[in-house]
């Protein structure tokens, strides 16, 4: 199979942009599916560092400078607009470059969803699949992959509870991680961790309050919202690059992820598991699927729950090896089988017997998970 993979116009497809989940999904997807022998053509920034058969430059450093000036995305949230100079350059060049390379039954993958739809709409002869959907609106492609059942069911809505209109090719495949990016460690240091965007939507104030009430040290890392004041008793590290994140997660006794919205996935939660680190989360969204209460961490509904979760961590009730074992369900090797099956099923609609095509026995068990 051949995949045309569209980059994110305001970033560079490289490990450096670890704060952008969309960029990291694209980066790892290319490596994951290239390892299965597929052809990967990546369209993105000139400094991209991605495993592929061909990288096609469609934006440059000058484009980003013209659009964003000297803005430092490491200190604040990403700044972009789909009408800005970088996006317009991306659209213009990607449309042209895809036209030079596309073949019948190629896949076109918009990893930034509607943010790059303008490119996809020009190439409607390709098989457009929205991969890893975790955004709340503007879904449009015929073929959709959601990153959790939580976001998929939210997309379906209550009306689908009473109607028999589910679409067979709207599927759920979780995010995927390179296990080599993390250090598994059983011996932990004396701190708890919050890593992610520093603003109230991610529940950072809950992590701060819970750590204070439980009497434990809290380290915090991530892009900070303008004007957000970090209390003196919290150690704020700022933006954490790949190596800093790796060390922080490996050393933490546990990580807080008290997201206040319905979390579409929460990749940091799985990254912690791969580091052997338990997670303390809210009890909704993808956490209900990926954080096994009492096994990989705890899911909480009250401040008392968050404090009790810390108390249990202090008593050693969660085993690092259990966290790792469940986290390995999200490895590149494991999730690649799910994507292989899905793309095969979709391609059968164009080249085979569609829904009635025989299943590949080697891919049929792709949904199987291992549990501690």
Kindly give the residue locations of the regions a language model identified:
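Catalytic cores of nucleotide-sugar-dependent glycosyltransferases that transfer UDP/GDP/TDP-activated
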Residues: 1-372
């Amino acid at each position: 199979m051949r995949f045309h993979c569209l980059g994110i116009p305001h970033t560079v497809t490289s490990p450096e942009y670890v704060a952008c989940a969309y960029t990291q999904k694209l980066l790892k997807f290319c490596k994951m599916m290239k390892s299965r022998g597929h052809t990967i053509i990546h369209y993105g920034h000139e400094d991209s560092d991605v495993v592929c058969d061909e990288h096609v430059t469609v934006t440059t450093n000058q484009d980003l400078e013209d659009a964003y000036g000297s803005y430092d995305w490491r200190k604040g949230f990403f700044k972009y607009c789909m009408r800005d100079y970088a996006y317009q350059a991306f659209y213009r060049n990607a449309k042209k470059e895809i036209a030079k390379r596309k073949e019948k039954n190629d896949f076109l993958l918009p990893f930034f969803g509607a943010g790059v739809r303008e490119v996809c709409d020009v190439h409607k002869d390709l098989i457009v699949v929205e991969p890893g959907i975790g955004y709340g609106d503007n879904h449009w492609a015929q073929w959709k992959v959601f990153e959790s059942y939580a976001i998929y069911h939210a997309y379906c809505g209550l009306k689908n509870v009473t109607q028999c209109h589910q679409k067979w090719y709207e599927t759920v495949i979780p995010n995927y991680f390179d296990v080599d990016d993390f250090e598994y460690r059983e011996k932990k240091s004396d701190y708890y961790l919050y890593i992610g965007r520093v603003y109230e939507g991610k529940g950072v104030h809950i992590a701060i309050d819970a750590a204070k009430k439980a009497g434990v040290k809290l380290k915090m890392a991530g892009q900070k919202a303008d004007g957000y004041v970090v209390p003196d008793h919290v150690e704020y590290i700022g933006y954490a690059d790949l190596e800093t994140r790796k060390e922080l997660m490996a050393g933490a006794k546990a990580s807080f992820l008290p997201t206040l919205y319905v979390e579409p996935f929460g990749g940091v939660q799985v990254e912690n598991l791969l580091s052997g680190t338990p997670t303390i989360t809210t009890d909704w969204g993808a956490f209900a699927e990926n954080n096994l209460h009492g096994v990989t961490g705890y899911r909480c509904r009250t401040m008392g729950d968050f404090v009790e979760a810390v108390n249990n961590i202090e008593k050693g009730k969660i085993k690092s090896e259990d966290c790792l074992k469940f986290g390995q369900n999200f490895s590149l090797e494991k999730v690649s089988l799910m994507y292989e099956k899905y793309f095969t099923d979709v391609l059968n609609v164009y080249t085979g017997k569609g829904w009635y095509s025989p299943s590949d026995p080697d891919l049929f068990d792709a949904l199987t998970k291992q549990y501690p």
